[in-house]
């Protein structure tokens, strides 16, 4: 398959993962606002899907890396994809922590603070998506 097409698919996978994680954080915000209650189980399911996507993306990056040395733009996209998948793997746990916290927290001020953190993560992911 053409290298550009494979790199484009990889980029789309990373962007899709960012969108999935944004959705996960939005669920946590809804929980924190007590508007649309979602169970921690649903957040954990999303975590598992993100983990599988990270593994797939990292596998594709490793497979494509030796082929793209002469093409700086393609190499840059692969490196960004690899970095993003690494960061997202670490970020995904925060949504679960927020969901568990929302289940038990009675302190309104603290809940608002966590909600702001979740919004900040979504903003960061939107910026990452824009980098492509």
Q: Over which residues does each language-model region extend?
A:
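Cytosolic, long alpha-helical scaffolding segments
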Residues: 1-132
């Amino acid at each position: 398959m053409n290298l550009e097409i494979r790199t484009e698919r990889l980029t789309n996978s990373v962007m899709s993962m960012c969108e999935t994680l944004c959705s996960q954080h939005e669920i946590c915000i809804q929980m924190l606002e007590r508007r649309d209650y979602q169970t921690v189980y649903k957040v954990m399911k999303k975590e598992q899907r993100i983990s599988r996507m990270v593994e797939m993306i990292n596998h594709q990056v490793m497979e494509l890396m030796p082929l793209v040395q002469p093409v700086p733009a393609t190499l840059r996209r692969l490196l960004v994809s690899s970095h993003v998948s690494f960061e997202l793997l670490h970020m995904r746990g925060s949504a679960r922590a927020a969901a568990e916290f929302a289940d038990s927290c009675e302190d309104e001020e603290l809940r608002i603070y966590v909600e702001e953190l979740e919004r900040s993560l979504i903003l960061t992911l939107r910026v990452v998506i824009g980098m492509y």
